[in-house]
Amino acid sequence: IEMTRGGTLENQHFGSVAAVNRRGDIRAYAGDPHWLTFTRSTLKALQALPFMEAGGVEHFGFTAKHVALMCASHSGEDQHVQTAQEMLEKAGQTYQVLRCGCHVPYHFEIAGKAPSPRETFDERYNNCSGKHAGFVAYCVQHGHSLDNYEAPEHPLQQAVRRDVARVVGMDANDLKLGVDGCSAPNYAMPLSRLALGYARLASGAADTEFGASFAQLSEAMTRHPDLVSGTGRNDLAFMQAG
């Protein structure tokens, strides 16, 4: 990607692409398919696996909307905040337990507007609040402390690391640890390994290890792309286009 200013080249951005089947075979690529990269928010659907595998959806009576929000980098619109609130209520908790922090919701930037000085925002407006509400629910279900659920050594995060490693076909100790913008652990891995994780996720019920969970996650995101994203965003348009 090239960016110009006044007709003169100012910036060049390079990237890599890897297309992988669910066996891990690289079928097509551009750039370096093994480039070591942090997964950031692409990891969210996989970070939900411990909750899904433990029967958390059924335990708390979550719907597809709640599952979709666990995978979201949402815009902090009313529907996103309300869905996060519902998840917390089902887990018997309030937004004060969320460890994601807060920021001005994305929908203001997308609309080209600034919030009123009178408006205040809490953790439910954070784009990662659904993921964190899922974290909280998992801890409640298993009797784990909520005080430091974002710490890498917490049983929740150990379960996340274990399941992510299984999905991408790596040893958990080989996942490179970092901290995401919402304070949760995040992992770097070769691009081809991340692509494998998404190939398996897309296979849904056909996956022999996580099929039931992948089917629920895929269906939820497909049915409720507006909860995964937000009004006016390109990724929402892509998802709605099928």
Identify the function of each model-found stretch.
Residues 1-34:
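Beta-lactamase-like hydrolase cores
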Residues 9, 39, 124-132, 151-156, ...:
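Short, contiguous, pocket-lining structural segments
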Residues 30-38, 70-74, 118-126, 178-185:
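A short glycine/serine-rich beta->alpha loop
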Residues 39-57:
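Active-site SXXK
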Residues 61-71, 97-101, 176-181, 210-223:
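Beta-strand segments within the central parallel beta-sheet cores of soluble alpha/beta enzyme folds
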Residues 63-174:
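Active-site-adjacent helix/loop patches that line small-molecule binding or acyl-intermediate pockets
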Residues 185-204, 213, 217-222:
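Active-site-proximal alpha-helical segments within enzyme catalytic domains
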Residues 210-242:
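Conserved SxxK-family serine transpeptidase/carboxypeptidase catalytic domain
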